[in-house]
Structures are given as C-alpha cells and as structure tokens.
Regions:
Chain B
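Catalytic Walker B motif of ABC-type/P-loop ATPase nucleotide-binding domains
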Residues: 159-163
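Conserved ABC ATPase signature
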Residues: 134-138, 142
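Glycine/charge-rich catalytic "coupling/switch" loops of P-loop NTPases
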Residues: 265-315, 332, 336-366
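A short, proline-enriched helix->beta-strand linker immediately N-terminal to the Walker B motif
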Residues: 153-157
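Internal alpha/beta loop-helix hairpins
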Residues: 181, 185, 195-265
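Conserved ABC ATPase "signature" region
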Residues: 63-66, 113-130, 181-182
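ABC ATPase NBD coupling module
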Residues: 64-85, 109
Length: 242, 366
C-alpha cells in the first residue's frame, strides 16, 4: 500500500502550510509575546483573551467568521483582492491566515512566560550598554530563549498540520491549493477508501509524533540545564476544541 | 554637572531631590534602607520612567535626559542613548555569552570612539583567565569584576553602581573596593555609587548625597558630610573623618608614612606594604572612637600621633557620649569621648588641646 500522487500532493501542501504559518507565527508571535510580557497597558487582558480564544472555540466557529471575512463583498477581502489580485476564500493564502490565528496561542503563550522569566534588569543592562529594543531582542532575548522558541515553533508546526475545522470552513477541498492531509483523509473515508485513509492517517500520526517528540526532547534538555534562562519546563500542550 | 530635579510619588513614598551633582570623582548616594537611593539611581539611569505628568528633569552636562514642566511635554532620552553603564548587586552578566563575549557586547555598542583598551582592562581586573568561561561558572567576586570591566569597556560618560558589594563576602568586597579605588582615578569616569555602608562611603566617595525617607538631607563633599555634627553620619558608632594629603617621607625601618597636615604638623601612618614614598596624595580614615583629648601633650606614650588642635564644636550624642570636633590647621578630626570627660577636663569651644590618635587606616590614593 503506497501513497497516491494526490496524497503526496496533500502531504506536501500540508507541510508547506505548516511551514509558512510557523514562519509568520514567529514573526508576529515573538514580538507580541515580548510586548505582553513587559506591558502594563490596560488592554493587555483583552489581547491575551483574544489570543487564547482559539484554544477553547471550536475551529468551525473561527472558520465561520473567517469565511464571512473572506467573502468578496467584505471590506477586508475586497482590499486583499485589490492588493494581491487573488481571492482569500478557498485559497492557500486564506488557509495561512486561518492557521496563524488558530495556532497563535501555541506560540504566544509559552513565549510570553519564557520572556517573563528573564529578569527585567538583564534587558535594562543591555540597554545601558547601548542596545536598542531590536538589538536587545536579537542579542539577548532570542538566544536566551532559544529552546522555548524552537519548542513553540515545533508546536505551532504540529498543530497547524493537524488542523481540520478551519480548513473545512474556509479552504474547501481543492487539490494542490487547499486539500491538506486531514481533508484528503476525510475524503477517503467519505468515499469508503479505507486503505488510502489508513496510509494517510498513519503518515499524519507519524509526523505529529515526531514533532512532539522533538518538543519533549528539547524540554527535557532544558530542564537538565538547571540555571540557564528560557528553559521549557512550562510547556503544556493544551486541548484545542476539536 | 548632573542636574536633577525629581518629584516623584510612588504609592505613599515621596522622592524629592533637587540638586546638582559634580561629574568628577565618586558621588555616593547614601542613606538607610528604603530611603529612596536605588529609586533615585534607577530614575537617573532611565530604568524607571517617572510618571509622564509629574514635574521632573534630569540633564547630564547639558544633555537632556528627562524633562517635564508646565511649558514642555514629557521627554525621556532612551537608556541606550545615555552612554551610561550600570553595575548591580548581582553583576547581571548575560548568561548565554562567555565572559569575552560579554565584554565584546559592550565594545561593539560604543557610541563614541574610546581608547579604553580590552587588554588593559582585563589586566587591571585580573580576568584574562576567565575569558572563555560562562558567567554561571564564575564566583560572585569574579562576576562582579567582569561586570565592572564590561561597564568600563562600554566607554560610558557615567557609571552607576547599585550596592555592588552587598552580595559579596568580606574578601571579595575588599578586592572589588580596591579595584574601584584604582579605576576611578585612572579613567576619570564619574561614578554614582549607591550604598548604605559607611566603610565604602569613606573609602570611595568624594562627594555625598544624603537621603532619608525620600528627602535630600545634604549634598556635600565627603570631608564636610562626615564631620558635620548636625548630620546623622557623625553620630554613628563608627563615625570618623577622612583626611587627604601628601606624604613627606617614608620611614623604611618602621614602615611609616609621614603625612603632611600643613602648618608644620604631620601624622605617622603605618603601611606594611609600602617600599617607597608614594608620589600621589593619600587618603586616611580616623575613627572618632580612636581619638582622645589631653590638655597637655603626653611625652611618654606609645601613641605616635599627638597633635595640637582647637575645639570647634561639641555635641552630646546620647547615653553620656559626646562628639568633639577638632581643627588642626584646615583638617578636621572627630573625637568620641564621654560627657564626663568633657566636664572633668572643662572642655569648651575655642580651647587649644591635644588630640591623641590611636589608630589610622590608610585607605589608598586620594
């Protein structure tokens, strides 16, 4: 029993989606986590709540609202169409946006608590030595939380790979564009092609297993490095509503 | 000049400091715990930002660091543009970088060219052998030496110290104190030094800001502040004065330095480590408890230093103890004696007496 070309397409698409989403999540999520770790702004609880929502909402709810946001008569979607010349609904870009929102808490929450554990005076000392904020981030924060960052990225990657509900709502099932592993699997089961479903399910299972294995291996090493900052002993994989 | 005008309210604590601080030598911010010393230092550093509506200002040699008044909006110069270095109790080295990279971190971010040299600093602070180590593998004293080296290598226009010795044991304290004494003379970088330790104050400070409960009590040169009988420092158990002066000669046979007090007077100071007459001025400390008063100069006494002085002030401390301020030419001494002695000897202000000095500590170069 081997993977069919369509299945391979779905696997590659899933990997691509997970990779692109993870990259975007790091770019958005790390600064956001740093801001949350430092700010005393009154809107902080509001932002934290918004970020945590995907943890408890059924993905279909997020998907539903995204679907509405992506409809061509929507302000956001029509501007997107104008700027990029493609529609968001039933497109890879749309999936990326959905995945980023869906997996944001998996990056922001562990990184926020990682950053909170770095003493404030460490960054102030760096500032006094002439480091501006961006410099502080790259020269102090990022290297000190390297382990947490790798773990958070792996978690976001794994979580994006397993996504179903959001894709179902906004992606449709277009091979090569929006048909990710979970959708292809669903298709196989619907059409009673259990053999193909087995292969695909096993592939996803194995990929997820190794992703998580990496995270927990890093976490363990972090724990054994007693004194170093940014250890990942806080890592918890939460139950998302799916 | 560091021009400070701070009027901050933090909860129920009020910090009011409006003063000018000289930007040469070592200025100590001294006071009991919770007097607002570190809070003041943090505001000067920019580590804590005062409330945007409060009237505060700080400028360093006419460079504006903080400003808010009724006419102007809030202005706060970012920390990284202030050219300061900050040394804390815990050294605060970057744990992911080796000692050498910690030092390079400072050098790479200098805002101005500087001739402060990496090798020179490593030699002075004896950290050459530590360069490849990670900070977590250093002792407390070693970490603090690296932190001081890093501060100097950033070529700052001001170094702020927040009780840098308080986390160290006695040996390490002594070593770091020694380094600090040497360094501030060599580099001419002003130090702003928070401490509540009188010993550190006497050894390092040229100038003192005295704080109590958030209020500035005095801002004076060290000599004045130690000998001012109206200030709390002269009333402490280990109160005393420091005297700075030139050395006339070194007596090799007895290992004694002859300190010139002017007006033909001198003090003999024992220095076991000296080989020759020091070229520079020296600083000594004389505790009030080591100075006694006689009406006539004892000729047969083991005490080497007996000098003619004039009583300029007498203040009763408590429990029958008194502090007497003595003038010798333009130098001051304090003597802690009992109120009973004052009465028995009939001591009054303006009287000429002799001060017998039992112990003198050589603190280092002035």
């Amino acid at each position: 029993m081997f993977l069919t070309p369509e299945d391979i397409t779905a696997i590659l698409l899933t990997l691509k989606l997970a990779a692109v989403s993870t990259a975007i999540l790091l770019v958005i999520g790390l600064p956001l986590a740093w801001w949350l770790a430092r700010t005393q702004n009154r809107i902080k609880p509001m932002i934290e709540t918004l970020i945590a929502l995907p943890l408890i909402l059924p993905p279909t709810v997020i998907g539903f609202y995204l679907l509405i946001a992506f409809s061509p008569d929507n302000w956001f979607a029509s501007h997107w169409q104008q700027w990029f010349g493609t529609s968001l609904a039933f497109s890879f870009s749309g999936l990326v946006i959905g995945s980023v929102i869906y997996s944001l808490p998996f990056v922001v929450q562990p990184m926020q608590s990682s950053y909170e554990r770095i003493p404030k005076i460490t960054l102030l000392t760096a500032a006094s030595l002439g480091a501006n904020k961006v410099d502080q981030f790259f020269s102090i924060l990022l290297p000190m939380t390297k382990r947490s960052t790798i773990a958070a990225a792996s978690l976001a990657f794994a979580h994006t790979m397993g996504e179903f509900g959001v894709v179902l709502m906004i992606g449709g099932n277009i091979p090569g564009e929006t048909q990710v592993i979970s959708m292809a699997l669903y298709d196989h089961v619907e059409s009673l092609a259990y053999d193909r479903a087995h292969v695909l399910a096993l592939t996803l299972l194995a990929m997820s297993f190794f992703c998580l294995l990496i995270i927990y291996a890093i976490d363990r090493r972090g724990k054994s490095h007693g004194k170093s900052h940014g250890k990942n002993s806080h890592l918890r994989i939460r139950h998302a509503g799916h | 000049m560091l021009d400070i005008n701070i009027n901050e309210t933090l909860g129920s604590f009020k910090l009011n400091v409006d003063t000018l601080i000289p930007t040469d030598g070592v200025t100590a911010i001294f006071g009991p715990s919770a007097s607002g010393k570190s809070t003041l230092l943090n505001i000067i550093a920019g580590f804590s930002v005062p409330h945007k509506t409060h009237m505060n200002s700080i400028s360093f040699n006419h460079q504006r660091w903080l400003k808010k008044n009724s006419a102007e909006p809030f202005y706060h110069l970012p920390i990284h543009q202030r050219r300061i270095a900050y040394v804390t109790q815990t050294a605060c080295l970057f744990s992911h970088l080796t000692v050498e990279k910690n030092l390079q971190y400072a050098i790479n971010r200098r805002l101005v060219a500087s001739d402060i040299n990496f090798n020179d600093i490593c030699t002075r602070l004896k950290i050459h052998t530590l360069l490849d180590k990670l900070p977590d593998n250093l002792s407390g004293g070693e970490q603090q030496r690296v932190a001081i080296a890093r501060a100097l290598l950033s070529s700052p226009q001001l170094i702020l110290f927040d009780e840098p010795l308080s986390a160290l044991d006695e040996n390490n304290r002594e070593e770091i104190l020694h380094h600090l004494e040497q360094l501030h003379q060599s580099f001419g970088i002003p130090f702003l030094y928070v401490t509540h330790n009188l010993e550190e104050l006497m050894r390092l400070a040229d100038h003192v800001l005295l704080l109590n409960n958030g209020q500035l009590i005095a801002n004076q040169p060290i000599g004045d502040i130690l000998s001012d009988l109206t200030l709390p420092l002269s009333q402490q158990q280990n109160s005393g004065v420091i005297i700075e002066g030139s050395v006339d000669l070194f007596d090799k046979q007895y290992q004694l330095l002859k300190l010139n007090l002017g007006n033909g007077q001198h003090l003999w100071i024992s220095d076991a480590n000296a080989n020759e007459k020091p070229a520079h001025n020296i600083r000594i400390r004389v505790y009030a408890k080591d100075v006694s008063i006689t009406l006539e100069a004892a000729t047969q006494s083991s005490i080497l230093n007996i000098i003619p002085v004039v009583i300029s002030e007498i203040s009763e401390v408590k429990n029958g103890q008194a502090i007497v301020k003595l003038n010798c030419d333009n130098h001051l001494l304090l003597s802690r004696i009992t109120a009973k002695s004052i009465q028995q000897l009939g001591l009054v202000v303006g009287q000429s007496v002799f001060a017998q000095i039992k112990g003198i500590a050589l603190l280092g170069a002035a």
